[in-house]
From Swiss-Prot:
It comes from Escherichia coli O157:H7. Its cofactor is a divalent metal cation. It catalyses: N(7)-methyl-GTP + H2O = N(7)-methyl-GMP + diphosphate + H(+). GO terms for biological process: nucleotide metabolic process. Belongs to the Maf family. YceF subfamily. The record marks 12, 70, 154 as: Important for substrate specificity. InterPro entries: ITPase-like_fam, Maf-like. This is 7-methyl-GTP pyrophosphatase. GO terms for cellular component: cytoplasm. The active site is at residue 69. One of its GO terms (molecular function) is nucleoside triphosphate diphosphatase activity. Its EC number is 3.6.1.-.
Length: 194
């Protein structure tokens, strides 16, 4: 049975994959994440997830390698990590009363036989109307400076939303586990069977 590799150093993706109670290792993929000028958000995350998984194939032959990438889209524009409190407040002002869509690309690459499975999972976050005071307090309390969209849905960010829409809530954190389980089963690795 091939061993499992997560092509990521993200502690959030690691924590999500640990939910499946299967052994795996993490490795940093070497991929240029610069978007191509003609790529849609869906195309970007699909390409990057695939490249991340395949970039580790030579280091990990005979493995199942998981690649994942995510973008946050508001008003048709990709929204990155804010990195500063002012940028976080600006992103949250734009999101207030709007829908932010996350696209998460997922790839499972079998480096033993070259079989590749891919999927893009969308997830919509409906923001309620936020006051300036609410935005300021949220940024001060949560410090979401390294989170695309300037919030942590798994934390205090839940207070910002009217509703969430998507097939798998794990998608919002960065790894669609329902789709991944389906891919793993197709490779003969059922998480429920050890």
């Amino acid at each position: 049975m091939p061993k499992l590799i997560l092509a990521s150093t993200s502690p959030w993706r690691r924590a999500l994959l640990e939910k499946l109670q299967i052994s795996f290792e993490c490795a940093a993929p070497e991929v240029d994440e610069t978007p191509h000028s003609d790529e849609s958000p869906r195309q970007l995350v699909l390409r990057l997830a695939q490249e991340k998984a395949q970039s580790l194939a030579s280091r990990y032959p005979d493995h199942l390698i998981i690649g994942s990438d995510q973008v946050c889209v508001l008003d048709g524009e990709i929204t990155g990590k804010p990195l500063t409190e002012e940028n976080a407040r600006l992103q949250l002002r734009k999101a207030s009363g709007n829908i932010v869509t996350f696209y998460t690309g997922l790839a499972l690459f079998n480096s033993a036989n070259g079989h590749l499975q891919t999927e893009v999972e969308p997830f919509d976050v409906h923001f309620r109307h936020l006051s300036e005071a609410e935005i300021d307090n949220y940024v001060r309390k949560e410090h979401p400076l390294h989170c695309a969209g300037s919030f942590k849905s798994e934390g205090f960010g839940i207070t910002l939303f009217e509703r969430l829409e998507g097939r798998d809530p794990n998608t919002l954190v960065g790894l669609p586990l329902i789709a991944l389980c389906q891919m793993l089963r197709r490779e003969g690795k059922n998480p429920l069977m050890g």
